[in-house]
Amino acid sequence: MRAEKQDAPVLSRWMKVLLGVSLAVLLAAAAVIGVAMHDRAAYPRVLEQICALDADAAERTLHGVIFFHDADEPDYARLTGLALQTGDDAYAVLSALEDEPFPAAFGDACAALEQGALDALMAQARAAYKAGDTDTALRDFELLCERDYDAACADWLLLARVRSGCTMSALAALYGETQDAVLARLTALLPFADCPAAILSNAGCAEAFLTGRWTSADGKSLTLTRSGAGYQMQTDLLDEAVPGRFFLRDGVYSVGADEASAQPLLRFEIVDAGTLRVTRVSDGRETTLTRS
């Protein structure tokens, strides 16, 4: 009878231990299940965040995965990396999306990222153009035109080609048009962006635009005509004739034996398709000319 009385407390203690262990196991299992649910939910959330173009949030979500990693995690990481890169090099992002396709389940996120990259590329292309980086601007605007981003891309591309030094004959070949048709394209752009300055930055385009007779209200005139392989300019805007060849660079008309030693005489500014503002370098006198 005494042994039986001693066994009951021992059994009770073991039951408590067993219950404690069971509870700990259940809590651990619940924690594991919670982590699993958290990890599994992270991947769809990454795609949602990329669709919203929130690359930083997508990166944080992906880094928050603890134990249960999706088989496609490398693709999630690659897509997130591209999203993070969009603000710095949208061209590379678009190239990667085209060259290395993602699984079909990533379709919506890829489409959103592509559109975001195109938007970023337009801004980057314009910034490159304004900074004088014509090589990058040409590359970016060409891709935007290939993707039919918007109608303005073709206008920006034409200006980038002019700024890059394309001759009128090269531009005509690129567009499959005559040089007169290319000039009409450029003239139709005025005053879009810096089109007036772009035309004057390219000697061939400037000469083509200035060709013809221009007159002022007080009877002054300037005439540019094609002469053989070059051009000839006649004007009474100067007090006296200066001997030598004429050169036209960045809107400045100079005359001399060669370009390095040529004397700057007139500075041109395109007001619109039929109006020029001409400034004499010697005294700053301005004259407005209209196309006759």
Q: What are the residue ranges of the model-derived segments?
A:
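N-terminal Sec-pathway targeting helices
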Residues: 7-26
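Alpha-solenoid helical repeat scaffolds
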Residues: 43, 74-78, 108-109, 122-123, ...
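Alpha-helical repeat scaffolds
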Residues: 58-65, 89-100, 136-142, 167-182, ...
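Alpha-helical linker/edge segments of TPR/alpha-solenoid repeat scaffolds
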Residues: 82-94, 114-130, 158-173, 192-208
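Edge beta-strand at a domain terminus
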Residues: 200-206, 218, 242-245, 277-292
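N-terminal glycine/threonine-rich, aromatic-flanked beta-hairpin/loop signature
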Residues: 215-262
